[in-house]
Amino acid sequence: MIPKNMESFLNEHLPKATFKARLKKDQGKCYLEFSNLDVHLLSHLGIISDKVGPHLVACIWDEESPLEIGGYVVVDSLAGGRPSMGGIRMLPNISPSDIHNLARGMTLKNAAANLPYGGGKAGIVAERSLSAERHTKIVRGFAKLIRRYKNIYLPGPDVGTNDADMKSIAIENGLDNALSKPADMGGNRIDELGAAAGGVIIALQTPLKIMPRLRILPQFVNLEIPNIENLTILIQGFGAVGAHASRILKERLPEVKVIGISDLEGYLYNESGLPIGELFKLWKENKLVTNIYFKNQIISEGYKHPTKFSTNADNLLLEHAFCFIPAAPIFNYLCVRSSENPSMTVDRMGKWSVIIEGANTYSPDPYRKTARIRMEQIVYREKGVMIANDYLVNSGGVIFAAQEHIVKTPDHLQIPEEMLGNSEAVNRWLKDHTNEFAELSKQRLIAGQEY
């Protein structure tokens, strides 16, 4: 059945005549498709088309499933190459405009990384509290829906999905129709490796070398770059990007202090540095860490404990540090106006010297672009904070994932057509070719490292 949140959204934003004229059905699978020529209808969905795209916006659901299975696919542009490439986000209130924003970010990111792919994205409308079994069933149902677009859209993981979900999609649609699969499928498993986070840390190391040149600009004349042992970091969003970023940072630059992190349940701050090893282990086990760490370590000592905990995650952005890394799925972490509902307004933000955008923040929406320009004028031009844009710095994940398509799967390893959709048969196939898939995974990992 169509997800209730999705059904409410579509009924509210699209004329009834559109359903009659545009709805396509295929054995219970339902498709509402729009191109960038459908300017008026796209505007109803909150999407403003331009010279770049979108190439395709599809609202898709399975009306015959007893589960709520549905969501959106946006192929923004194929100008950079075919197919488009981008992850599948899984959240309860995801909208077509959200997916379009992310797809445009992928267009720019893939182009900036010189990858021969267009930009795309998908979103599954589903609760985050699903059981593992129900989650997998919904992902596999969604895989059947997006099979229609396999020639123009290549999915990977994003917020709410992971490498195991990409295996589920590959079981349904074939090895070459999902990215970031586990190693037993020859995949590059970007979530497990923390590939996106690795790019963020490289992006931090580079500005450290070039930032002294900024002192010729009036807003940076008093810029102070601390010694490495005095370098401090705040990370908004201790998740797939943020948690791995902290881990990789401590491996490459162990002297650097991560002094603040946040997640959905709050934030932790310690000016002497947080125990990243312990927090990363907690994240691997529980996904949310701030409240658990508070209960296990802080509550017994109260205010005497050197680490501060707050249930207001956004207030992390009040703290001071040399570098701030937004890594939460929030477009507007900073804005000038409180009416734009940011994590923090620029007049209240902490004192930082550089922002490395680990999260996807780009939006083609003209109103959001205007808000972004207002923010940058104050943060960069007035406050003297360097901003490293998301599509330039967080491309590590797509670079590694793309190798699964660039380094081709040999024909003899392709899952036979008659096995697709049969988990047991596919797993037997993988087991029978264990060594070859392991070697393929190794080749793709090396290719990503050398790219």
Where are these regions (language model features)?
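Adenosine-phosphate binding glycine-rich loop
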Residues: I2-F9, R348-Y451
